[in-house]
Each structure stands twice: as C-alpha cells, then as structure tokens.
Amino acid sequence: TFDEVIYIDWNSPTHSLLYDIKHNINFKGNFKHIVISPEIASILTNNDPQAQKCCEVLGRNIGLRRATGDYLVSTNIDIIHPRLEDLEKLIQQNDKNTFYTVSRRYTNWEQINNYYETNEYYHLDFKNNWKSLRNYLINVSTERHFDEKTVEGDDFSIINCCGDFQIATKEIWNEIRGFEEELIYTLYADTNVQKKAVMHEFGLKALYEPALFHIDHGKGGGGFLDGINKRANDPYRA
C-alpha cells in the first residue's frame, strides 16, 4: 500500500519481532527497520519503570521524523491496511490542511484462520495472496461509527482508538512536531496529537472509509488493561 514503510521495534527483550515474521513479508526495497533496545528505551524514558513498555509517542516520532513521503501515516502492526487505490482516493478527495483519523473495523484470528482453511490455495502462499483476505473482510464488514470523548467537553477525541490510523501531510506533522514526548505512559497521546493539529489551526476530521482492520489481540499490547502498563497519562494534561 505504501511507498515507504518504517518499522520501529521498541523495547523487545531479545530480538526484533521482524525476524519472526519476515518470511511472511514481500520486501520491495522501501522498508526501513529501526530497533530501540531495552537499554536505549530505558534511557529515552528517563529510566522510569512506569513508562509504557512500548512507548508509542517516542517510537512514532522516530519514524515520522525519518519519513520522506508527502503524506505520512502513523499506525500499528496489528492493522490490515487499506487498498492502495482507496488510500490514493482519500488523499485526492480530502483537504491537505486537515488532519485525519480513520475508524478501524474489527477482525480476529478466528475469522482470519477460518478464511484460509476454506481457501487452501491462499493459505499455501500467504505472503503473495493476503490481499484476498483483505478483500473478503471488506466485503463482509460495515463502517464502524463509534464516537468517544476522553473527558467531558473534549472535542478532540472524535472516534474510539483514533491512533490506529492517523494521516496528514508531512507539513502538518512537522508543524505540530509530532507526538508530545512527555506523554510516555499509556492512553490519550493519540487524542493529544489531534488537539495539537487544531491548536495549530489545521482541520480535524474522522473518516470511516477506506476500510482498514484491527486484528483483535485480547488484552495484550500497549494498553492499560493488560497489567503490563501500570500508569496512564493525565487526560487533563494531555
């Protein structure tokens, strides 16, 4: 889908996740891999034991500042991304002075595995045929309209889980200087970057197309409910 992909592996204890999944990836010469070891991650988060284990604001900024495209997307590895033609349509039809967040749709490994069991041909060559899975998910899914306010009166948390796909021009990302790097704990940082866009007099809008999918992983991940991350950012500070 993308002209350039930058993968930031943050704080993996032994080795980058990339080495476990690279056999399922078609590399096209546009992939950059940056590893932040546990030792460096600790230094960058002021040796704070309560910092988010996968510190999103720092990891995202490392990628954003090295990206070279006209439009930059901040996203996660548990997302099945839009089709290229749909993403190009988004860019062509929308305002270059607006910061966008695209609402994710839902899938899980049970649905994915059932699809490949039914379509054995695709299972045998997953990395070359995964697009068929995405087309299937698009056909059986609907737009996810799920609004959310982080705190009362908050006009910036315009959809739930807004950080799974945020897109804006490079000029907007540079003007707002990316994510706020004091927000090293979990929650609210994705809403905060949208607030920063508005404060810099850019537009802010939620979209429900193009279709993209979050692969459910239960309580594991970068959130607050899984027991890994013990502290949340202050929503009023954010």
Question: Which residues are covered by each model-predicted region?
Answer:
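Conserved glycosyltransferase catalytic-site signature
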Residues: E56-N61, I79, L84, C161-F165, ...
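C-terminal catalytic/acceptor-binding lobe
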Residues: D154-D155, I159-C162, E182-A238
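Short beta-strand/loop segment that forms part of the nucleotide-sugar
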Residues: F2-P13, K32-P38
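Active-site-proximal specificity loops/subdomain of glycosyltransferases
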Residues: L17-R66
